[in-house]
């Protein structure tokens, strides 16, 4: 169980999350839509230090070594090729199979990772994340910039992760979460505006539209 207790995150004078509390069961795919979703994932990974509140996994502070994170705008060290990045991933994750992932999310192996177009950089970041055996995986705007085929393949991979018992958080537009999550949350006004089971998508859309955050 990931427990987020009274989390507050500010960006200058803006309050992104204001005393937000969530309880996310382990071994499930959780969708996060609405305002402040990227800030939440960044706090879970430790890129953002909350102004207040705490985050725990199984009753203990959530550690970065337990978490894998794919940023919305992935960045790579200059000079490293795609092959170099994959070799490093395999070195740290023996037994992982990048070839199987690349068949679903293809990236040119000899290209410089940092110089890839945006969609290919995103595919590489997702491949590297999905090779990661960590207990919790965070995907921030994973569908942004992907072509239709890649988005379909990614949806299948997320479903596979769920069937394997991984704990996955997907931050995306509400429409992109339908059919891939065990449950999903709509954020707004600094907190959770609604929590929905996977079969309640239509109700989530109606309520999000009524509050003006359906497309955020």
Where in this protein do the model-derived segments appear?
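Conserved structural motif at the start of ABC-family nucleotide-binding domains
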Residues: 2, 17-19
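Helix-to-loop junction immediately C-terminal to a conserved catalytic motif
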Residues: 45
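Conserved ABC transporter NBD signature motif
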Residues: 50-65
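Q-loop/switch helix immediately C-terminal to the Walker
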Residues: 73, 78-94
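Hydrophobic anchor residue at the start of the ABC signature
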Residues: 125-126
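Catalytic Walker B motif of ABC-type/P-loop ATPase nucleotide-binding domains
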Residues: 137-141
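Helical segment within the ABC ATPase nucleotide-binding domain
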Residues: 151-164
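Conserved beta-strand-loop-alpha-helix hinge in the C-terminal portion
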Residues: 191-213
């Amino acid at each position: 169980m990931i427990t987020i207790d009274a989390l507050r995150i500010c960006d200058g004078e803006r309050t992104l999350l204001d005393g937000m509390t969530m309880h996310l069961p382990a071994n499930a795919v959780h969708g996060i839509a609405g305002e402040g979703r990227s800030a939440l994932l960044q706090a879970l990974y430790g890129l953002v230090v909350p102004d207040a509140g705490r985050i725990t996994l199984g009753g203990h502070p959530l550690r970065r070594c337990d978490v894998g994170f794919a940023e919305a705008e992935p960045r790579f060290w200059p000079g490293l090729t795609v092959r170099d990045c994959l070799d490093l991933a395999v070195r740290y994750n023996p037994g992982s199979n990048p070839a199987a992932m690349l068949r679903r999310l293809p990236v040119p192996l000899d290209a410089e990772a940092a110089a890839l177009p945006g969609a290919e950089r995103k595919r590489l970041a997702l491949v590297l994340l999905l090779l990661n055996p960590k207990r919790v995986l965070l995907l921030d705007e994973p569908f942004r910039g992907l072509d239709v085929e890649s988005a379909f393949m990614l949806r299948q991979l997320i479903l596979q992760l769920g069937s394997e018992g991984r704990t996955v958080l997907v931050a995306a537009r509400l429409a992109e979460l339908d059919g891939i999550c065990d449950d999903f949350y709509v954020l707004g006004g600094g907190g959770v505006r609604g929590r929905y089971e996977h079969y309640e998508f239509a109700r989530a859309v109606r309520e999000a539209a009524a509050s003006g955050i359906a497309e955020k």
